[in-house]
Amino acid sequence: MKYTKFEKARIIGARALQIAMGAPVIIDIPKNVIDPVDIATIEFENNVIPITIKRVSKVLN
């Protein structure tokens, strides 16, 4: 799925907060990566973040 830059920022930010609060990391990351935002970005790039985006279509009358 193609995400807008706003959706991408929201997904990475939400996942980074989860990681910072102690949520388990889903994929193996390099030992030198400790920043939650960097970890969330790696997860996003590998399409493993467990967050779903629900888009609502606008219906014009």
Curated annotation (Swiss-Prot):
Principal localisation: cytoplasm
InterPro entries: DNA-dir_RNA_polK_14-18kDa_CS, Pol_omega/Rpo6/RPB6, RPB6/omega-like_sf, Rpo6/Rpb6
EC identifiers of the protein: 2.7.7.6
GO MF entries: DNA binding; DNA-directed RNA polymerase activity
GO BP of this protein: transcription by RNA polymerase I; transcription by RNA polymerase II; tRNA transcription by RNA polymerase III
The keyword Cytoplasm belongs to this UniProt entry's keyword annotation: yes
Localization per record: Cytoplasm
Entry keywords, A to Z: Cytoplasm, DNA-directed RNA polymerase, Nucleotidyltransferase, Transcription, Transferase
Cellular component terms per the entry's GO annotation: cytoplasm; DNA-directed RNA polymerase complex
Enzyme kind, highest EC tier: transferase
Keyword DNA repair: no
Signal peptide (UniProt feature, chain positions): none
Reactions it catalyzes: RNA(n) + a ribonucleoside 5'-triphosphate = RNA(n+1) + diphosphate
Pfam families reported for this sequence: RNA_pol_Rpb6
Entry similarity comment: Belongs to the archaeal Rpo6/eukaryotic RPB6 RNA polymerase subunit family.
Subunit structure: Part of the RNA polymerase complex.
Function: DNA-dependent RNA polymerase (RNAP) catalyzes the transcription of DNA into RNA using the four ribonucleoside triphosphates as substrates.
PANTHER family attached to this UniProt entry: DNA-DIRECTED RNA POLYMERASE SUBUNIT K (PTHR47227), DNA-DIRECTED RNA POLYMERASES I, II, AND III SUBUNIT RPABC2 (PTHR47227:SF5)
The protein's name: DNA-directed RNA polymerase subunit Rpo6
